[in-house]
Design a protein with these regions (language model features):
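Acidic, metal/ion-coordinating pockets
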Residues: 1-170
Length: 170
């Protein structure tokens, strides 16, 4: 599972922001050659090249048969060696702890392992914040096995909580 922080496209125009990220569509081969089993697009850069860039990214992933979580909160289930892994991705501006808990409870009924992949926290902060802790623990309480956080661009704490593992930022 990776957080695809940008678009795979030759289309679209960069949005007006400090950093806009994209790679050519051929970069999907890097993912397939390195056994990437799923991708989350639930981040602040998946729309860097507008709707055309986002649609191109999804089409390239579809062609490569790499399942993905959409940019706003959504889920995907992928099967590897008979094991169903459910991934739930969410972006900080769409995080409602009650909705996340309900979605994870539902996903845990369909998957053997549930990974919650939030895009959250403060950039360049090595400390997780109280909202991250609250949401991560609620996700585990609801049935997630792993919390795989991204966004701060630095490592944050790892915590074993009840029967789950939380990486606040990798």
């Amino acid at each position: 599972l990776i957080n695809l922080e940008g678009a795979l496209t030759e289309e679209g125009y960069a949005v007006h922001k400090d950093n806009s990220f994209r790679g050519p569509t051929s970069y999907v081969n890097i993912l397939t050659q390195n056994s990437v089993e799923a991708v989350t697009l639930a981040n602040d850069h998946s729309m860097d090249y507008g709707q055309k860039g986002y649609d191109s990214t999804k089409a390239v992933l579809d062609t490569a048969k790499i399942p993905y979580v959409e940019r706003d909160s959504s889920t995907v289930i992928t099967t590897k060696n008979g094991l169903k892994v459910g991934v739930y991705g969410a972006v900080y501006y769409k995080m409602d702890v009650d909705q996340i808990s309900a979605d994870i409870r539902k996903l845990s009924k369909e998957a053997d392992i549930v990974v919650f992949a939030p895009h959250w926290g403060y950039e360049n902060s090595a400390q997780c914040n109280s909202d991250q802790e609250k949401i991560a623990r609620a996700a585990i309480d609801a049935g997630a096995d792993i919390v795989y956080g991204c966004h701060p661009h630095v490592l944050q704490a790892m915590e074993e909580y009840k029967s789950g593992v939380i990486w606040y930022s990798l």
